[in-house]
Amino acid sequence: MAEQQPRPILITGAGRRIGLALAHHFLQQRQPVIVSYRTPYPAIDGLREAGALCLQADFSSDDGILTFAEAVKSHTDGLRAIIHNASDWMAEKPGVPLSTVINRMMQIHVHAPYLLNHALEALLRGHGHAASDIIHITDYVVERGSDKHIAYAASKAALDNMTRSFARKLAPEVKVNAIAPSLIMFNEGDDEAYRQQALDKSLMKIAPGEKEISDLIDYLFTSRYVTGRSFAVDGGRPLR
């Protein structure tokens, strides 16, 4: 009998930073990976060379989201997990209509996960008890809000709430959890003053790197019991 191939993990927004690191993490485990990307960063070529199936996607419209879902279904009839990492960042500022800001934030952080979870549900089901996972990457601002990024915080809070709703809908076959990170890694252009200021906002005073997220996801994938929960990865920042 031929050995059964593992089901792919789908990661949205894997062109850089945490999404990119997660894709390489699972590829190193010989786990098939499907990624979405919006911008063709050079790192996408590296993912292809490492064995990932890389699909360009436009989540700025519902049609674009559903077209991507159909593309995924054309390549596989089962998924091990969906990691909703695709994200956008837009502040309320003069000259930009508020409706533009809220619609853009809700489109990427709410419409995309909502539609994809429904469209790809059948690919996650049918593999046994707690055999599949959905991970929503939210943000620590879900807990405290943001006066400068109100729409962003609201959209991530909606995604956090959907975690519990989908956990109820998809149990016991599929576990659904959220991860709410604060500072995980710096950008190359961040100067020393900014870095120190950012580090001082948490109790642990480090930028832990992407491994902190991949280790947590490994645990959640292994668990057969944990679902409907949000895990803060913030170094104790709310306690400062």
UniProtKB/Swiss-Prot annotation:
Q: Which Pfam families match?
A: adh_short_C2
Top-level enzyme category: oxidoreductase
Q: Where is the active site?
A: Y152 (proton acceptor)
Q: Which keywords does UniProt give here? A: NADP, One-carbon metabolism, Oxidoreductase
Query: What does the record give as EC number?
Result: 1.5.1.50, 1.5.1.3
Single biological process term from Gene Ontology: one-carbon metabolic process
Q: Which SUPFAM superfamilies match?
A: NAD(P)-binding Rossmann-fold domains
InterPro entries named among the record's database cross-references: NAD(P)-bd_dom_sf, Sc_DH/Rdtase_CS, SDR_fam
Reactions catalysed according to its record: (6S)-5,6,7,8-tetrahydrofolate + NADP(+) = 7,8-dihydrofolate + NADPH + H(+); 7,8-dihydromonapterin + NADPH + H(+) = 5,6,7,8-tetrahydromonapterin + NADP(+)
Task: Please provide, alphabetically and separated by semicolons, the GO molecular function terms listed in this UniProt record.
Answer: dihydrofolate reductase activity
Keyword hit for Transcription regulation: no
Among NCBIfam families, the record links this protein to:
PRK06483.1 (NF005066)
Its function, per the record, reads: Catalyzes the reduction of dihydromonapterin to tetrahydromonapterin. Also has lower activity with dihydrofolate.
In the record, the note on similarity to other proteins reads: Belongs to the short-chain dehydrogenases/reductases (SDR) family. FolM subfamily.
Name of the featured protein: Dihydromonapterin reductase
Per the UniProt record, the lineage of the source organism begins with: Bacteria, Pseudomonadati, Pseudomonadota, Gammaproteobacteria, Enterobacterales
